[in-house]
Amino acid sequence: CHAPCGHYAAVRQFVEAQGRYEYGAVNHALCAAIRELLKEFAVKVCQLESLLRAGSLSIAKLWYHIQPSMDTFALLYRVTAHVYGSIGGLVLNGIQDVMARSSLTTAQELCEYLLQQASQPYFETVSRWIYEGRLDDPYAEFFISEHMAGQRAAQNDARAGARSRDERVGGLGADFWHKHFVLEERSVPQFLAASREKILHAGKYLHVFFSVGGKQLQEPGNQGRLRYSRRQRDCVEAIDAAYRRASAALLGLFMGPPPVGL
């Protein structure tokens, strides 16, 4: 019983430690998913206790009921040990690493469930970025960060103003593109790696569009909720569509008449 009990205790400790505020939304979502599994296990223990008191719990029946839970906590121990101390995309990558090393279907399904739950707040950040050009990342979990030196340079350009369309492209826009936002390669989730540049530029383009143009942009007609799936086609297509929309918006801004005040 030593190993299973140790796994259970370690998982509970992880939830208590890494569920704290400073560990970010991805960890909060992961810990919430694990808490649900802990609750399910507590219910099972109560049911087994009732069978024991009724005199109908044999060793064979106990083993039959408890073995799946032992496997679950062994896997949860591997996951939590692998991601301990990490935040954001590194947590998601850690779960995916454990899933890739697991040969049992049940283990892969559990890892996929954890990824789906833990990635929800991450995809909300991605959505705000690629659909609104808004970087809302209070825990510094996202793989795109705001570079303060670039921000100051962009603000200086904005105060100086641009007097022609070409100046707008080479002035404020250039600083936003090259200085204002930075892609942190180490923090990119594996399942978004192929789309990371389009995600970066879609948000950048919209950020410039709204900062320079101050215009309303039509909502994307096919905007769907981004979510994790081992079949990533739908997510990739949504990101591609968001990138095309952002590119068209910025092109239209630079090809059209200068915004008022520029």
Q: Where do the language-model regions lie?
A:
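Long alpha-helical rod scaffolds of large eukaryotic non-enzymatic complex subunits
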Residues: 1-262
